[in-house]
Design a protein with these regions (language model features):
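A conserved mid-protein helix/loop that constitutes part of the nucleotide-sugar donor-binding site
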Residues: 18-22, 205-219, 238-239
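Nucleotide-activated donor-binding/catalytic signature segment of Leloir-type glycosyltransferases, i.e.
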Residues: 240-261
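Short alpha-helical donor nucleotide-sugar binding micro-motif in glycosyltransferases
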Residues: 268-273, 361
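Aromatic "clamp/platform" in nucleotide-sugar-dependent glycosyltransferases that forms part
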Residues: 281
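Membrane-proximal helix-turn-helix segments that form the acceptor-binding/catalytic region
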Residues: 126-154, 160-163
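A charged, aromatic-enriched C-terminal amphipathic alpha-helix characteristic of glycosyltransferases
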Residues: 322, 336-367
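Glycosyltransferase donor-sugar binding loop
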Residues: 224-242, 259
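Short hydrophobic beta-strand element within catalytic cores of glycosyltransferases
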Residues: 298-302, 312
Length: 369
């Protein structure tokens, strides 16, 4: 069976990319011929460095022959149109990035309906005539695409995402557990000799809200903070520089910023740390939180979105915060009560294993065909 998998780009290697790779692995186990369709060429050397145990597709089609740098706002609509044309060549089509790519497919994964959410425009779009001219056609395209955005099955990863999809798309989504490589991260959980250290992990992107972590670190000079972040484009690099500037401005000796580290290095850091902090607000899920928990770190997350509602279950399996003072208090509690909180975190993480996702997705595909 020929199956097409559509994803914006694997290069960021965030949670959505791990879902895409797990989908490919599941399809390969079913002996399907898998074609990955992306907007830009995949940097496989980078992807394999960050996740060595991946299964590549049989073929890859890059709609753009060069990396995305300009006009990406508009190019995603062109990519959706092209995938709509290409899907005719497949027996089954899967869109693993339905959040921002409204391309019709038999199966659509959507963390959160980002592209359909009504938000206030950034200041530059209504203060600058040039930006107004640039942005108006996008708003028109955005309003047109929901008409043709169809699927047989719509999947999401949290109650938070399910409720948002219901609100913005008036559609019912099926909740699927996020695929997390529990086995690999759980190796780190056996080490009990750990530092009073807080780890954050995710791409260097503004929505990760690392400024908040820097502010918290100012109040906890006796605790080390490490931010492990990926940089795959100029935008991420710019945000990294902003955070690095803050750390330097505050002269924080207890904050370390790492970029594009290997999975081996990441797990080694986890094995010697006690707390995993997640500062993003209204994150639809947060795969990094589960990875940290599997490695034996106590989660301390913002009281919003999937991490708070679906992963730590509003304090049952970790701690939360809504302010800097509350974050400081939660980190101190997590370190003080580390042994007992660690056990809860590890047990909770086991419910999100990649193998469980693969088996469930294989059953879903077999029932669909």
């Amino acid at each position: 069976m020929k199956i097409g998998v559509f994803h914006r780009s694997l290069n960021p290697m965030g949670g959505a990319e791990h879902v895409c790779l797990a989908v490919i692995e599941a399809l390969k186990e079913l002996n399907c011929e898998v074609t990955l369709v992306t907007m830009e060429p995949t940097d496989w050397s980078r992807v394999c460095k960050l996740n060595p145990k991946i299964m590549k597709p049989d073929k890859e089609i890059s709609i753009l022959k060069i990396p995305m740098k300009f006009l990406s706002t508009y190019l995603k609509f062109y990519a959706c149109h092209m995938f709509g044309m290409l899907r005719r060549n497949f027996d089954l089509s899967i869109n693993t990035h339905g959040d921002i790519l409204p391309a019709p497919a038999d199966i659509v994964f959507m963390y959160y309906p980002v592209i359909f959410e009504s938000k206030p425009l950034p200041e530059k779009y209504y203060k600058s005539l040039l930006w107004k001219i640039y942005y108006q056609p996008y708003l028109l395209l955005k309003s047109m695409f929901p008409i043709n955005f169809k699927w047989k099955l719509l999947l999401t990863f949290s109650e938070f995402g399910k409720n948002a999809i219901k609100k913005h798309l008036s559609s019912e989504a099926i909740i699927f557990n996020q695929p997390v490589d529990i086995d690999e991260f759980s190796k780190a959980s056996f080490n009990n000799c750990r530092l009073n250290r807080v780890v954050l992990c995710g791409r260097y992107s503004p929505e990760k809200n690392y400024e908040f972590a820097v502010e918290v670190a100012r109040h906890l000079p006796y605790i080390e903070f490490i931010i492990i972040g990926s940089i795959s484009n100029k935008g991420y690099e710019s945000y990294y520089n902003k955070i690095a500037h803050l750390v330097k401005e505050y002269d924080l000796k207890n904050v370390k910023l790492l970029t594009n580290v290997s999975r081996e290095t990441q797990i080694d850091i986890y094995s010697k740390s006690k707390v995993f902090m997640h500062t993003a607000v209204n994150e639809p899920f947060g795969i990094a939180v589960v990875e940290g928990m599997a490695a034996g770190l106590v989660p301390v997350v913002h009281k919003s979105g999937g991490p708070w509602l679906d992963i730590v279950k509003q304090g049952e399996y970790g701690l939360g915060f809504g302010s800097v003072d509350e974050a400081v208090e939660s980190i101190n509690i997590a370190i003080k009560n580390y042994p007992s909180l660690k056990i809860k975190a590890i047990e909770r993480a086991k419910t999100f294993s990649k193998q469980k996702f693969i088996e469930a997705f294989k059953s879903l595909v077999l029932n669909l065909i």
